[in-house]
Amino acid sequence: MGIEVKNLVKRFGNFTAIDDLSLDVPSGELVALLGPSGSGKTTLLRIIAGLEDADKGQVIFEGREVGKKNAKDRGVGFVFQHYALFRHMTIFENIAFGLEVRKRSERPSKDTIRDKVMSLLKLVQLENFYNRYPSELSGGQRQRIALARALAIEPRFLLLDEPFGALDAKVRKELRNWLRRLHDEIHITSVFVTHDQEEALEVSDKVVILRSGKIEQVGTPDEVYNHPKNSFVFHFLGDVNLFHGRVQGGQTQLGEIKVDTPEHSEIENASAVGYVRPYDVEILREPIEAQTIPAEIQYIHSTGRNVKIDLKRLDTGTILESQLNSSEFQSLNLLPGETVHIRFKKIKVYVEDYTI
């Protein structure tokens, strides 16, 4: 048993940040809370930590209700985005702080504290930095020290609020890979907030996608990305092209293309939207009858391994994006201004509307 929240409600004035939300975090898993700004992810994390009080609902740790306990008594380690290290203390003193401020009857001996701190420094691969000050460390190193300090008190759960948000892209990628390896080593039940879709999909065992204080989908990275529950999840998790059309009798007409949509076989004459990832937009030199849409190449941009191509549909004038790998692009020898034809490798059709 890990963390369970039941029917949580949290309001700030007239704004409902958490709206009757329930969630299970299994023991030993690393779970990401992901969503747009204002979706409630940080508020949910702070309620779990005891830094915010819910207006309604329960927070349960390993089968025991902890809603009335303050943050200090919940046994959680919390890592903030901006490190929150004590500048006047050495790295050793920062990590030891949570142990040294315990009341005397619960405080470990100095030798035990020293061994614990040095063990954690080794765990975060900074054992030679124990006598330095935070100002002498890089941002990535400071965040690893903040994590070591959170682990020093031997928490039952680890909570992280956008732990890599203040770091540059390269360091952020290195640290999230490191966090995944660390979690696999210590297996502490962990929940982290992120606004970075790639980060959530790379690091976590499960992703919780929130919108307007409610959960839209919970699943493994593969489940939420490749089998999105609704149009909001599909649109939120990466770039997408939208194709408007109508559903009738198990088929959807999207401009000049008709696609089979048996999942909507009972719907008659309803507006629909087809969702296609850029890498599922295939570019052809010659048309294929009833399967392609003519388009003009507007812009070509290489990102190194891949090439992004903006195209304008000749039937509607709308702009869409295709993504090719470099070898595909070279074989087609495309140039701006050329007319080509596009078709979809994969498309998902939704009938309901979405908003972000």
Curated annotation (Swiss-Prot):
- Where in the cell is the protein located? Cell inner membrane
Name all ABC transporter domain ranges. 3-237
Q: Which GO terms describe its cellular component?
A: ATP-binding cassette (ABC) transporter complex
Summarize where ATP binds, as residue positions: G35, P36, S37, G38, S39, G40, K41, T42
Q: Could you tell me the EC number(s) of this protein? A: 7.3.2.3
Checking Pfam families in the record gives: ABC_tran (PF00005), CysA_C_terminal (PF17850), TOBE_3 (PF12857)
| Keyword terms | ATP-binding, Cell inner membrane, Cell membrane, Membrane, Nucleotide-binding, Sulfate transport, Translocase, Transport
Q: Which ranges of the sequence are coiled-coil?
A: none
Listed GO biological process terms: sulfate transmembrane transport
Q: How does it sit in the membrane?
A: Peripheral membrane protein
Q: What is its main location?
A: membrane
Q: Which reaction does it catalyse?
A: sulfate(out) + ATP + H2O = sulfate(in) + ADP + phosphate + H(+); thiosulfate(out) + ATP + H2O = thiosulfate(in) + ADP + phosphate + H(+)
List the signal peptide residues. Answer: none
Protein family: Belongs to the ABC transporter superfamily. Sulfate/tungstate importer (TC 3.A.1.6) family.
Q: Subunit structure, briefly?
A: The complex is composed of two ATP-binding proteins (CysA), two transmembrane proteins (CysT and CysW) and a solute-binding protein (CysP).
Function, as annotated, reads: Part of the ABC transporter complex CysAWTP involved in sulfate/thiosulfate import. Responsible for energy coupling to the transport system.
The protein in question is named: Sulfate/thiosulfate import ATP-binding protein CysA
Species, as recorded: Leptospira interrogans serogroup Icterohaemorrhagiae serovar Lai (strain 56601)
Which gene name does the record give? cysA
